[in-house]
């Protein structure tokens, strides 16, 4: 399948340092555990709706939710209008499926002073986006933590291969809720607990939203989702998986632990762009665009929690 159009957005707000609070013992405990497992000495968050005027220690916990919802709308507009007028009209009149993704599922309970309407937008499905793309067929939401985008792409790949739909639109974002970010990293890095980073530093979590439009119409980026590989070695070049002779670059969208050296031939997306949960794998396309790569293939690897990994390949012209 081909990536016909896509758009990213991250907050304009600055980074804010997280401060543990005795009012939330479990969150503070998860924070300390996550620091140990990632070998860091602090955590910075960049979130939509962060407000400088509130108490400093609460900035990362209590952002406004409206800017996040508005960002989803803006990024969808950008992806739609980056297509040609002919393609845009074809999308609106063709068989189109809509998939909404996020990392946490029903996370509205962590939002501050949220209405029931906005709660349903974040937790279930943004109805304004469904109307924007004139979706009259399939809509669904995938909550798969770091694998959300990969699972949605695999579903889109099947839909297009079976000729069920002409276009598949995937929209979603990563809401960097501190407690959930801490527990997620603790699970990913549990096997390397209590080790120190090669270079001590601060973890960075950045909220990002994205919209991706897939079709069978030829474009500059061709995507293929591989299977999940249940192996304990986490080696993305296993010879019995798939021929890797045409892989020029390897992008790693794993946990943010830095206790082991990263191979020189690979791209650590989190070290380069910051951690964005389910949106992190899509940063490999941003890397291709940023460095204007031509005529090659980039493999993006998403490691599992226990062992194994999933991957998808991107051929760029």
Language-model-derived ranges and their functions:
Residues 1-146, 158-164, 174-177, 185-317:
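Conserved "HGTGT" condensation-loop signature of ketosynthase/thiolase-family condensing enzymes
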Residues 149-150:
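Beta-rich nucleic-acid/ligand-interaction surfaces
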Residues 153:
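Short-chain dehydrogenase/reductase
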Residues 167:
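Short, Asp-centered acidic motifs that coordinate Mg2+ and/or phosphate
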């Amino acid at each position: 399948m081909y990536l016909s159009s896509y758009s990213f957005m991250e907050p304009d707000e600055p980074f804010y340092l997280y401060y543990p609070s005795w009012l939330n013992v479990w969150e503070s405990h998860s924070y300390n555990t996550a620091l140990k497992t990632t070998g860091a000495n602090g955590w910075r968050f960049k979130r939509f709706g962060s407000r400088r005027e509130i108490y400093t220690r609460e900035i990362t916990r209590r952002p406004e939710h409206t800017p996040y919802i508005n960002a989803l709308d803006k990024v969808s507009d950008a992806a739609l209008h980056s297509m040609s007028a002919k393609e845009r009209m074809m999308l609106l009149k063709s068989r189109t499926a809509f998939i909404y993704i996020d990392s946490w599922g029903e996370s509205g309970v962590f939002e501050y002073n949220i209405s029931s309407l906005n709660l349903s937008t974040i937790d279930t499905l943004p109805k304004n986006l469904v109307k924007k793309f004139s979706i009259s067929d399939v809509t669904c939401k995938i909550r798969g933590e770091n694998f959300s985008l990969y699972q949605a792409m695999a579903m889109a790949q099947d839909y297009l291969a079976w000729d069920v739909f002409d276009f598949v639109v995937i929209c979603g974002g990563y809401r960097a809720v501190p407690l959930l970010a801490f527990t997620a990293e603790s699970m990913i890095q549990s096997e390397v607990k209590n080790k120190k980073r090669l270079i001590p530093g601060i973890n960075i979590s950045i909220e990002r939203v994205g919209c991706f439009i897939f079709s069978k119409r030829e474009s500059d980026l061709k995507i293929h989702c591989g299977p999940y590989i249940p192996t304990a070695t986490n080696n993305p070049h296993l010879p019995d998986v798939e021929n890797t002779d045409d892989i020029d670059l390897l992008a790693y969208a794993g946990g943010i632990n830095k206790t082991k050296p990263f191979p020189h031939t690979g791209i650590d997306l989190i070290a380069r762009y910051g951690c964005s949960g389910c949106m992190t794998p899509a940063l490999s396309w941003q890397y291709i665009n940023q460095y204007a790569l031509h005529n090659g293939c980039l493999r993006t690897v998403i490691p599992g929690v226990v062992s194994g990994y999933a991957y998808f390949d991107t051929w760029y012209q």
